[in-house]
Amino acid sequence: MMHLTFIIPRFQYSTIPFLLTFILAVGCDQLPGKPTPKERWRPATEVTDFSQLYALNCAGCHGADGRLGAARPLNDPLYLALVSAATLRAMIAQGVPRTSAPALAQQVGGPLTDKQIDLLVEGMRSRWGKAESFNNVAFPPYSLQDAGAKGSGPGDSQRGAVVYQTYCAQCHGKDGNGGPKGGSVINPAYLALVSDQALRTAVIVGRSDLGMPDWRANIPGRSMSPQEISDVVTWLASHRQAASIAFKSK
């Protein structure tokens, strides 16, 4: 009877270090659960991804996708066409007076580098802006200072009351305390959180995420004039002052 004999080579223990080195060199970057380069921790000042920067610094107030937040939507092509890149950058870097928008630049104690602020501005305008759609739109002056430089007079509260009844009362109520489509625009708590410029911006571009029309659409075929915008903003702001005086007198 014939027997088959298998010859098994003796394992050389000296090969173990070589095998371990080979496995670590070849398979280390493919281990299950290992984070990708994008997922790895990095210092906050080295984050250069727009989505991460926006989520960490802006989404809490302006909404996860730039809309439906407590503050003005930034995902609004009309707003981004009205506001220059330099103005937007200044607001991010220096904050906005009389609002809860903080200064984010490192030079004033914020967390963001100049490069990160530039990335936020560029990201908003490239992702959410449609400047070419507004090439033929004659925008009102963005600020009261711009309005003065272009020939408009200062706002007048008495004229503003008439402007309010014409363009705004149908949504916000005859006295400004709220109506069928919009909330109060003279509530002291609201006015304490917004600047005059924020009021002006809201009048000009509306709130696209909440259905508030811009300066062209309150009355079909009749846009608000730059003077009317300044007047109604002055009327709105006068309620902030009146509320402050009433509070101090108590």
Regions found by a protein language model. Give the residues of each.
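Long, charged N-terminal interaction/targeting segments
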Residues: 57, 71-73, 77-119
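Disulfide-stabilized extracellular ectodomain repeats and their linkers
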Residues: 55-58, 71, 98, 165, ...
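Flexible coil segments in periplasmic/lumen-exposed cytochrome c-class electron-transfer proteins
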Residues: 32-40, 44, 48, 52-55, ...
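N-terminal secretory signal peptides that target proteins for export/translocation
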Residues: 1-11
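Sec-dependent signal peptide recognition
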Residues: 12-19
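C-terminal motif of bacterial Sec signal peptides marking the signal peptidase cleavage site
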Residues: 25-27
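Sequence contexts marking disulfide-bonded cysteines in secreted/extracellular proteins
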Residues: 29, 59-62, 172
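Gly/Gly-Pro-rich "capping" loops immediately C-terminal to redox-active cysteine motifs
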Residues: 40-47, 51, 63, 67-93, ...
